[in-house]
Design a protein with these regions (language model features):
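Helix-loop-helix
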Residues: 51-52, 155-177, 248-313, 318-319
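Transmembrane helix-loop-helix hairpins at lipid-water interfaces of multipass membrane proteins
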Residues: 2, 20-80, 84, 157-170, ...
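ABC-type nucleotide-binding domain
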Residues: 335-589
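Short active-site loops of ABC-family nucleotide-binding domains
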Residues: 90, 110, 118, 122, ...
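Cytoplasmic coupling helices
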Residues: 83-102, 116, 143, 171-216, ...
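Hydrophobic alpha-helical transmembrane bundles that constitute the permease/transmembrane domains
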Residues: 28-36, 71-79, 131-134, 138-153, ...
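A short amphipathic helical element positioned immediately N-terminal to and/or at the very start
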Residues: 2-17, 120
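An intracellular "coupling" helix at the cytosolic face of ABC transporter transmembrane type-1 domains
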Residues: 14-18, 109-110, 126-135, 139, ...
Length: 589
């Protein structure tokens, strides 16, 4: 079962197979020194104390030197076994985490709507560690402990032949299988509790991630006590589940030891009844103990396998998730892109909830198209289909007449720049954050993009200029500054298609004015989709698509739509009233 379940992942040991083999080899040396060496020494050393005919001179020195020799072999073999296994284990853990992370990078956005960030972090960091333990430490134990057991049993067979105590030896060996009985009974319980504990660990990570990502909101709404209670409840639930796992895990060793004690006592009773010599009794009891010790450790291995199996189930959920936005088998090459986008009878749904229903539209090259409508009408979904964040259920989306599913995702997305409503910056320098759209850009190119985005002046005002660290998610910059860096990214990419997800909706008037000026420059000579929440954003749009209930119910200029479309008129008038009351630009409700 172990090989069948974990076998496919042993390939991760291939780059460190030499170190892994060395570790196993030294483990066998340590096992042989423990399983047969110690009982053998005891058999010959007991007569030194009990016999009148004691060895003398060199014979005594050689006999006594066997003690440090056996312990040296055992200790050195154990150390080198542990070192090489740790080396192989860390390499496997590194590769496992990279493998899972790489898979996550290629999963569609829909996957992240169904799985929270904290749980995914737990799978990448925690569950990979459990799998690494199974692949390295378990295999090590499955080689080393049986070798100790076989060595000890081999010594018992040797004594059986040399001392003619076949009956006693059979009785002694018959007690060994009794130690295996608790392993299976407890293993099933550990598997169940481990699955629950690992799932709860993911939930705890999610609570922590949400809290740390919403520090301002927690303070602003006095949610500290609520958040402490949430975190405490999650920690306590994990504690209860982990405690149950530990209870079953740690129960196994005492049960095996108790069984061992009864078995040794029974064997000693039989030995006394048969008048077996003290040195033989001592060596037999030592050999029997060396049999029970690996059985106890193998019981622990069984528990480790159960825990790793629960982790493997969670990892394979990620690894075996199908990419619902697959690459084309033979992608067509992209040449000079003009930017013509066509939606042909497109239908799309989120979990059977229709978001777009048989939508058809044509966007000419270099046109700026504003997408307006009530919340949930389909504006964002429409824009997200262009870079293939999702795939249509029915119909097609074409770029310059080519179905975008026939293009490689990398080629398609290289032609599209995106400026989001809340632009995320990475914890790096300003220059490197702008370079995300063109990693090999020179500093002069970065500065030129920043100038076009009206960002150069405020960047130069920082002491470190373009080498200024922005902090986690850009926390050291204002909202307007973050947005202008995101716009600079888009300028640097210089893509023929740009998607603007209302980048001015949460800004003050001054920041909005600067960003509007930058966006006007960004829209020139490009095909632009503007997801509009503020009607001030669409002043320069060539056409406006009005969405309602997953359909485009009208399209035209502002003047045409205001006169002919009741929904558009209602949305605009509602924002106009808001503008009059707040002395600001209209914002969509």
């Amino acid at each position: 079962m172990f090989l069948k379940r974990f076998g496919p992942y042993f390939s991760y040991l291939k780059p460190v197979r030499k170190q892994f083999a060395l570790g196993l080899g030294f483990g066998l040396i340590s096992a042989a020194a423990s399983g047969a060496g110690l009982p053998f020494i005891i058999k010959f050393l007991v007569p030194l104390v009990t016999s009148d005919d004691k060895p003398q001179g060199m014979a005594l020195i050689l006999l006594l030197s066997s003690i440090p020799l056996a312990f040296t072999l055992r200790a050195l073999g154990g150390f080198l076994n542990a070192y090489y296994m740790a080396y192989a284990g860390m390499h496997v853990l590194e590769r496992l985490r990279i493998m899972v992370f790489e898979k996550i990078q290629h999963l569609p956005l829909a996957f992240f709507h169904k799985n929270n960030v904290g749980d995914l972090m737990s799978r990448v960091m925690g569950d990979t560690g459990q799998l690494q333990t199974a692949l390295v430490k378990v295999v090590n134990s499955l080689v080393k402990e049986p070798a100790t057991l076989v060595s000890a049993i081999g010594f018992l067979i040797y004594l059986t032949i040399s001392e003619s105590e076949v009956a006693f030896m059979l009785i002694a060996l018959a007690t060994i299988p009794a130690c295996v009985l608790p392993i299976r009974a407890i293993g099933t319980r550990i598997l169940k509790k481990s699955r629950q504990a690992q799932q709860q660990a993911g939930e705890l990570n999610n609570v922590l991630n949400e809290n740390l990502s919403a520090v301002r909101e927690v303070r602003a709404y006095n949610l500290e006590t609520r958040e402490i209670n949430r975190f405490t409840a999650a920690v306590r639930k994990l504690f209860q589940l982990a405690l149950k796992t530990v209870k079953y895990d740690k129960m196994l060793s005492p049960l095996i030891e108790l069984t061992t004690a009864f078995a040794l006592s029974f064997s000693l009773y039989v030995a006394v009844q048969r008048n077996i010599s003290p040195e033989v009794i001592a060596s037999i009891l030592t050999a029997l103990y060396m049999c029970y010790e690996p059985i106890k450790k193998l019981g622990g291995v069984s528990n480790t396998i159960r825990k790793a199996q629960a982790s493997l189930d969670r990892l394979e959920y990620v690894l075996h998730t199908d990419d619902t936005v697959p690459e084309a088998d033979n992608p067509k090459p992209l040449t000079a892109v003009t930017g013509e986008i066509c939606f042909n009878n497109v239908t799309f749904a989120y979990d059977n909830e229709v978001a777009l229903n048989k939508v058809s539209a044509k966007i000419e090259p270099n046109q700026a198209i504003a997408l307006v409508g009530p919340s949930g009408a389909g504006k964002t979904t429409f824009a997200n289909l262009v870079p293939r964040f999702y795939d249509v259920i029915q119909g097609s989306v074409t770029l310059d007449g080519v179905d975008i599913r026939e293009l490689s995702k990398a080629d398609l997305r290289s032609q599209i720049a995106l400026v989001s409503q809340e632009s995320l910056l990475f914890s790096d320098t300003i220059a490197n954050n702008i370079r995300l759209s063109k990693v090999d850009a020179t500093l002069d190119e970065v500065k030129e993009a920043a100038r076009m985005a009206h960002a150069h002046d405020f960047i130069e005002a920082f002491e470190d200029g373009y080498e200024t660290l922005v902090g986690e998610r850009g926390s050291r910059l204002s909202g307007g500054q973050r947005q202008r860096i995101a716009i600079a990214r888009a300028f640097l990419k210089n893509a023929p298609i740009t998607i603007l997800d209302e980048p001015t909706s949460a800004l003050d008037a001054e920041s909005e004015h600067q960003i509007q000026a930058a966006l006007e420059g960004l829209s020139k000579g490009r095909t632009v989709l503007i997801i509009a929440h503020r009607f001030s954003t669409i002043q320069h749009a060539d056409r406006i698509f009005v969405f309602d209930d997953g359909e485009i119910i009208a399209n035209g200029t502002h003047t045409e739509l205001y006169q002919s479309n009741p929904l558009y008129t209602s949305l605009y008038d509602k924002q106009a009233k808001t503008a009059l009351s707040t002395n600001s630009e209209p914002t969509e409700s």
